[in-house]
Amino acid sequence: MNIVEIAKNLIKCQSLSPYDAGCNKIIIKCLHNMGFYVEKMKFGKTENIWAYKGTGYTLLFAGHTDVVHAGNVKNWKYPPFSSKLKDGILYGRGSADMKGALAAMLIAAKKFFKSYKEPKGRLAFLITSDEEGSGSNGTKKVINVLLKRKEKIDCCLIGEPTGEKNIGDIVKNGRRGSLSVKIIIYGKQNHVAYAENNNNPIYHSNKIIGELLKTSWNDVQCILPKTTMQIIGIRSNIKKFTNITPSKVEIIINFRFNFKSNKKIIKEKIVSILKKYKYFYDIKCILHSDPFFTKTGNLLKSVIESVKIYQKITPCIINSGGTSDGRFIYKISKQIIELGLLNKTIHKDNEHIKVKDLLILCNIYQYILKKILIKN
């Protein structure tokens, strides 16, 4: 199969997270045909692939087969899983995020091993069907298995869609950490007609939120963007009635933080605000990921060089955006770069990619393989 055929076949699989829906069969067949050792790791409903070929210095290609829901299919030009190719544009859910990049990786590997029978290093693949969802049974668990085996991964290229206007104009070498916080403010349930006696936790929560919004969490940008806070939800324990006040209110918050913050620092700031108002409260913090950052190394140099050659531009290193599976891979590899297709239609109606972009990305990946596994 050529790169377009692989991409089309992957897009046709309705792999809503965490279901693989047949993507792995396509990928495994391609890998076996190249002589890769392939191991399937299934955790719960999630299907993962760990595969490699060669020995020594290891470059990992990482990605995911799962996709988000297509939404209202009436808003699509073509059915979201029909994999429609029209005028050089390939439509379909997951085309940009990130089945197109997976096809580019596979063809880049095929061309590389056709040219170099015995490279100096090892190429590995880690593919999961649980990246868009919770991520609990995906890359995270595979990495834990690899750590127990004492596997070594020297550098990792993740095919997340990073491009804004052109392939390679943006690459990422780090991400902020993610922390979710639930604050529970307690009051006293009462009849709404007796407002003067109300200990209403909604009013208490308003004061707390006001303080949170005024708080400086971290004004230092350092090597990653500033720490930010977003309030995700406010809900009371009253669901149906309209004549009673609630006894508690939950405030749900998410923080994206850089190396100048951490779970302990953020929690201490919140607690100091809660103590100031002397309300009864509980606070629960869930750390989803710590920040990570790749310093200059052979992978970043190779990525920049390849983009300059094939795109005639110098990529910008911008580490904004959400989390990626790099948060798990960082435990085993300190060189992680994200480089993929354009992100302007990801998770949207009519997600699509240009075939010419697929070919460019494949050439870039192939050049990186040569630089890392031949000239390293």
Curated annotation (Swiss-Prot):
CDD domains reported for this sequence: M20_DapE_proteobac
Annotated residues for binding of Zn(2+) 2: D97, E132, H347
Record-annotated active site: D66, E131 (proton acceptor)
Binding note for cofactor: Binds 2 Zn(2+) or Co(2+) ions per subunit.
Pfam families: M20_dimer, Peptidase_M20
Residue numbers binding Zn(2+) 1: H64, D97, E160
Catalysed transformations (reactions): N-succinyl-(2S,6S)-2,6-diaminopimelate + H2O = (2S,6S)-2,6-diaminopimelate + succinate
Cofactor dependence: Zn(2+); Co(2+)
GO molecular function: acetylornithine deacetylase activity; cobalt ion binding; succinyl-diaminopimelate desuccinylase activity; zinc ion binding
GO BP annotations listed: diaminopimelate biosynthetic process; L-arginine biosynthetic process; lysine biosynthetic process via diaminopimelate
Annotated SUPFAM superfamilies: Bacterial exopeptidase dimerisation domain, Zn-dependent exopeptidases
InterPro entries, per the entry: ArgE/DapE_CS (IPR001261), Bact_exopeptidase_dim_dom (IPR036264), DapE_proteobac (IPR005941), Peptidase_M20 (IPR002933), Peptidase_M20_dimer (IPR011650), Peptidase_M20A (IPR050072)
Pathway membership, UniProt: Amino-acid biosynthesis; L-lysine biosynthesis via DAP pathway; LL-2,6-diaminopimelate from (S)-tetrahydrodipicolinate (succinylase route): step 3/3
EC number: 3.5.1.18
Keywords for this protein: Amino-acid biosynthesis, Cobalt, Diaminopimelate biosynthesis, Hydrolase, Lysine biosynthesis, Metal-binding, Zinc
Matching NCBIfam families: dapE_proteo, PRK13009.1
Family membership: Belongs to the peptidase M20A family. DapE subfamily.
Function: Catalyzes the hydrolysis of N-succinyl-L,L-diaminopimelic acid (SDAP), forming succinate and LL-2,6-diaminopimelate (DAP), an intermediate involved in the bacterial biosynthesis of lysine and meso-diaminopimelic acid, an essential component of bacterial cell walls.
Quaternary structure annotation from Swiss-Prot or TrEMBL: Homodimer.
Name of the molecule in the record: Succinyl-diaminopimelate desuccinylase
Source organism of this protein record: Wigglesworthia glossinidia brevipalpis
